[in-house]
């Protein structure tokens, strides 16, 4: 929320001016740091935000067999959500097929060039945009029917967990039976 954004700005200014960062909203310094903790911890060791990704996926697809394992990380940017996503499908789908399916999906912009800067970032591409940006589309080396994707969006316009599910939904609807 706005209190967290204000704390990030304040801590950034304090640290750049050689002062110690004061923590009020976060349990530890957020400026120039990464926190593997969003929302409260549950008994199973996951946070509520991580379990919401699981619950929402099962709910949207209506399939209790879908498995999601997420680690949600707070990264100190003022706006934007970013996700590294691994998808395992029941049938093989090539990265080119996935790229074309996603390119045809409403609200998805593909930015996937294999060069420095050929991928989307939350701050530069997604801020102020309604579209979800997808890049770094590639075969997952650990799964024979797996894909890895990099996804960014403006969290003030679209929620991150929902968009991950929407992308997976597009792949399933258009390719996987």
Cite the ranges covered by each PLM segment.
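Active-site-lining helix/loop region of Rossmann-like oxidoreductase modules
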Residues: 1-101
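C-terminal active-site/capping subdomain that shapes the small-molecule cofactor and substrate pocket
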Residues: 65-177
């Amino acid at each position: 929320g706005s209190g967290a954004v204000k704390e990030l700005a304040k801590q950034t200014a304090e640290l750049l001016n050689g002062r110690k960062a004061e923590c009020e909203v976060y349990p530890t310094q957020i400026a120039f740091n990464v926190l593997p903790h969003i929302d409260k911890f549950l008994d199973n060791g996951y946070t509520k935000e991580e379990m919401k990704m699981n619950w929402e996926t099962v709910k949207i697809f209506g399939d209790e067999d879908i498995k999601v394992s997420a680690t949600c990380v707070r990264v100190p940017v003022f706006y934007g959500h970013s996700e590294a996503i691994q998808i395992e499908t029941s049938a093989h789908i090539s990265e080119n097929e996935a790229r074309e399916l996603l390119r045809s999906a409403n609200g998805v912009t593909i930015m996937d060039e294999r060069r420095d800067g050929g991928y989307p970032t939350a701050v530069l591409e997604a801020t102020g945009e309604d579209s979800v940006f997808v890049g770094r589309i590639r075969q997952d080396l650990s799964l024979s029917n797996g894909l890895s994707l990099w996804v960014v969006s403006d969290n003030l316009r679209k929620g991150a967990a929902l968009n991950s599910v929407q992308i997976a939904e597009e792949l399933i609807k258009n390719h996987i039976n």
